């Protein structure tokens, strides 16, 4: 029954669906995720407050006890679960991609499909099951997202490693995240979409030594991985440990590693530290061929209760475990953090061999058998390595770093501690979200640090006077709105980066982005700097970040004729606090809100629009009202008239929707991106883009447009636009949500 196609079920959710009839239609489902409808906790539940009541040290004590409390249903290798839990944490956080900010461990998504069933995550279902008694004990005070990562941290500590710290604060989600593009392949280990000459992979469940993945590319030394994915195969976290497509070539593997880890925001030193540090402990598992392994959790029968990959080889566990298909124990003390990994890497010469499952791996030449067995104390093994381990020796740059680490153990330990901390926290966002007694004091550049204002926050009367001063500068309100939007809309809900706080729009690289209209941006910033200077003559201070947002608020208020909320307290980042290379990934290729850019051969403009809206955590109604409002406010990045369908530009009217829904207007394509409209009744000519016309062509978006385009729609349109505007302006204000600022400071007279 579990394998029957959904469309054969004649109950709700079954049958042929819209996506079957029209697979290319614009999907809005990613704008309806992670809402109160799916969250079992009360609407007023605050995870941050619950975490603060957690017995943190008691939890860590319980986790340390678990490390050596081997369970019969899933015995611990070497009597210690450390290696398993390090892998669990690594594979939770390691899905992060800097290009779009998605993935990572911040939502606890390893519990859900597809991640819970990826070939690279075989046996991690058992790791989470081992954790359940502890999760059960502490309940809502610790999320799965936090617990999985903290467990990896505690595992390292219990094996003798000093970590850099840990921050909690990751609330759980309750459904599979549909917003992340993991690749276009439809088979496990396939990569024919992410690479132009890739392989189709295989449909069977199981481990990563699938035969289809070993056909190999003709261009493994030159191929380019599509953006924004970071893994070399569908269903892998990183790269194929046997080598590119199973070809045991350490140099070619290094190329894949460098691509993948750089897309995780890791440089070469961090990459070497993570691989060497992570492979210092634990082992891989490949006791027998993968045809012994049953279906993954999502395809397993109901009686398996969420567990997958049942193994018919021997006992199916312990010494008979099949996970990756590789059988490697790196060091002589796999439950202790040592320098053995790097020592052996350079001490021995390595020859290619096969695991019991038939996977490519390497064994030390002329070495004695001194590596312990995971379960039989009478057995010993020769040192073994993965192809990707040897990359750290045979890639010239990785080799330099690896040798330096070998010669400087304390440097290696510090590098691994920092890289591991970064891996676990890269998608956490601002430090104001970080919770717990182990938050490190040192500020790190990748945090995108923003100084906390060292002066009293402006009050209501200050806000009123500043708004008047801003509007008196003579800068067009549309330019003020464009600048405020440009600053705030860089926010990414995936990794909580970007946003108006910090005013990085005035710094490189954002001040050079075409979408930000650099010449106009400089004009607006100059005017606001003047307002700031005049205001501070009184002895008070205001951040330019606050002024940028306040300028937009003042302009929207003037256009709408109603008060617009404003929450002060932003700080100003410096260029030295800004990682230029990292921030380049926030530059939009297209921004429908400002009618900038266009689609590609694979992605339409409107698909990019929905993707951007999801990053801004917008609902479909919020997306609709913002686009319609920004058009009539003249927020197009280049001042074009596309979609500015109003006789009162600069006024917050519902004219965009009224005009769009006029049945007398017919449209013709100019180039597939821009369209010309003619009203047969008035003769009026219009122009619009795909980002405009989609609100009339897409049935669900049109339904929303009809609400705002109705005769009684103006009041609701204004109310909803102001609310959505305020939401975007404050997406990165986790400091306010956490009550770090005194509430009395925020009750400005607006």
From Swiss-Prot:
Catalysis: reaction(s): H2O2 + AH2 = A + 2 H2O; 2 H2O2 = O2 + 2 H2O
Location of the region described as Disordered in the Swiss-Prot/TrEMBL record: 199-218
The keyword Oxidoreductase is assigned to this record: yes
Annotated GO biological process: cellular response to hydrogen peroxide; hydrogen peroxide catabolic process
Description of post-translational modifications: Formation of the three residue Trp-Tyr-Met cross-link is important for the catalase, but not the peroxidase activity of the enzyme.
One protein family per Pfam: peroxidase
Organism: Pyricularia oryzae (strain 70-15 / ATCC MYA-4617 / FGSC 8958)
Alphabetical list of InterPro entries matching this protein: Catalase_peroxidase, Haem_peroxidase, Haem_peroxidase_sf, Peroxidases_AS, Peroxidases_heam-ligand_BS
HAMAP family xref list: Catal_peroxid
Name recorded for this polypeptide: Catalase-peroxidase 1
Active site (catalytic residues): 91
Reported pH dependence: Optimum pH is 6.0 for the catalase reaction.
Site keyed Transition state stabilizer: positions: 87
Task performed by this protein: Bifunctional enzyme with both catalase and broad-spectrum peroxidase activity.
Quaternary state and interactors: Homodimer or homotetramer. Predominantly homodimeric.
Primary location class: cytoplasm
Localization annotation: Cytoplasm
Protein EC: 1.11.1.21
Cofactor binding note from Swiss-Prot or TrEMBL: Binds 1 heme b (iron(II)-protoporphyrin IX) group per monomer.
Gene: katG1
Family per record: Belongs to the peroxidase family. Peroxidase/catalase subfamily.
Keyword terms of this UniProt record: Cytoplasm, Heme, Hydrogen peroxide, Iron, Metal-binding, Oxidoreductase, Peroxidase
GO CC entries: cytosol
Residues that, per the record, bind heme b: 279
Tryptophyl-tyrosyl-methioninium (Trp-Tyr) (with M-264) cross-link, renumbered residues: 90-238
One example GO MF annotation: heme binding
Basic and acidic residues: bias regions: 200-218
Cross-link Tryptophyl-tyrosyl-methioninium (Tyr-Met) (with W-90) placement: 238-264
């Amino acid at each position: 029954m579990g394998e029957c196609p959904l469309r054969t079920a004649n109950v709700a959710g079954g049958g042929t669906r819209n996506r079957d009839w029209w697979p290319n239609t614009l999907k809005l489902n990613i704008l309806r995720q992670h809402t109160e409808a799916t969250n079992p906790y009360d609407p007023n539940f605050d995870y941050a407050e619950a975490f603060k009541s957690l017995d943190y040290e008691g939890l860590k004590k319980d986790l340390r006890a678990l490390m050596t409390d081997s369970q019969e249903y899933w015995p611990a290798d070497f009597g210690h679960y450390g290696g398993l839990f390090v892998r669990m944490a690594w594979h939770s956080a390691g899905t992060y991609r800097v290009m779009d900010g998605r993935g990572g461990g911040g939502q606890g998504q390893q519990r859900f499909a597809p991640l819970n069933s990826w070939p690279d995550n075989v046996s991690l279902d058992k790791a989470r099951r081992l954790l359940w008694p502890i999760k059960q004990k502490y309940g809502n005070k610790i999320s799965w997202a936090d617990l999985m990562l903290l467990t990896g941290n505690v595992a390292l500590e219990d094996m003798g490693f000093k970590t850099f710290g840990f921050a909690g604060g990751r609330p759980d989600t309750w459904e599979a995240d549909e917003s992340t593009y993991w690749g276009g392949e439809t088979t496990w280990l396939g990569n024919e979409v992410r690479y132009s000459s890739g392989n189709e992979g295989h449909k069977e469940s199981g481990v990563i030594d699938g035969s289809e993945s070993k056909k190999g590319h003709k261009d493994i030394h030159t191929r380019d991985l599509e953006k924004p994915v970071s893994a070399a195969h569908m269903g892998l976290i990183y790269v194929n440990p046997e080598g590119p497509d199973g070809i045991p070539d350490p140099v070619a593997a290094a190329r894949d590693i460098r691509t993948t880890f750089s897309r995780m925001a890791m440089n070469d030193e961090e990459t070497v530290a993570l691989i060497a540090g992570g492979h210092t402990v634990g082992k891989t598992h490949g006791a027998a061929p993968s045809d012994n392994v049953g279906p993954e959790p999502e395809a397993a029968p109901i009686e398996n209760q969420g567990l997958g990959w049942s193994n018919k080889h021997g006992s199916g566990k312990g010494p008979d475990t099949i996970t990756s298909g590789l059988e490697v124990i790196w060091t002589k003390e796999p439950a202790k953090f040592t320098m053995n990994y790097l020592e052996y890497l350079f001490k021995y010469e390595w020859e290619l061999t096969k695991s019991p499952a038939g996977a490519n791996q390497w064994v030390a030449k002329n070495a004695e058998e001194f590596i312990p067995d995971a379960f039989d104390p009478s057995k010993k093994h020769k040192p073994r390595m993965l192809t990707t381990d040897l990359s750290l020796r045979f890639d010239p740059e990785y080799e330099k770093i690896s040798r330096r680490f070998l010669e400087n153990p304390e440097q290696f330990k510090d590098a691994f501690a920092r890289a591991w901390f970064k891996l676990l926290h890269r998608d956490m966002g601002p430090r104001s979200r970080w919770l717990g007694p182990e938050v490190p004091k040192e500020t790190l550049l990748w945090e995108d640090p923003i100084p906390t204002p060292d002066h009293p926050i402006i009050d209501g009367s200050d806000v009123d006077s500043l708004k008047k001063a801003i509007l008196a500068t003579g800068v067009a309100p549309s330019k003020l709105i464009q600048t405020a939007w440009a600053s705030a809309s860089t926010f990414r809900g995936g990794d909580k980066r970007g946003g108006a706080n910090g005013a990085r729009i005035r710094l490189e690289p954002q001040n050079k982005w075409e979408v930000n209209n650099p010449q106009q941006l400089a004009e607006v910033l100059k005017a606001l700097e003047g307002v700031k200077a005049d205001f501070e003559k009184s002895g008070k201070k205001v951040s330019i970040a606050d002024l940028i947002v306040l300028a937009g608020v003042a302009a929207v208020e003037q256009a709408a004729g109603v008060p617009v909320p404003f929450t002060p307290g932003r700080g100003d980042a410096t260029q030295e606090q800004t990682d230029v290379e990292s921030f380049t990934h926030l530059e939009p290729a297209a921004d429908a809100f400002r009618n900038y850019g266009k689609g590609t051969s694979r992605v339409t403009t409107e698909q990019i629009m929905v993707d951007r809206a999801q990053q801004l955590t917008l609902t479909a109604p919020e997306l609709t009202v913002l686009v319609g409002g920004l058009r009539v406010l003249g927020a197009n990045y280049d001042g074009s008239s596309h979609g500015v369908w109003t006789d009162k530009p600069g006024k917050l009217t519902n004219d965009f929707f009224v005009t769009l829904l006029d049945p007398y207007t017919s449209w013709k394509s100019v180039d597939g991106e821009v369209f010309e409209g003619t009203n047969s009744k008035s003769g009026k000519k219009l122009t619009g883009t795909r980002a405009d016309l989609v609100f009339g062509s897409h049935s669900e978006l049109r339904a929303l447009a009809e609400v705002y385009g109705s005769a009684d729609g103006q009041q609701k349109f204004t109310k909803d636009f102001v609310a959505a505007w305020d939401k975007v302006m404050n997406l990165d204000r986790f400091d306010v949500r956490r009550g770090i600022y005194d509430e009395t400071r925020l009750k400005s007279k607006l």
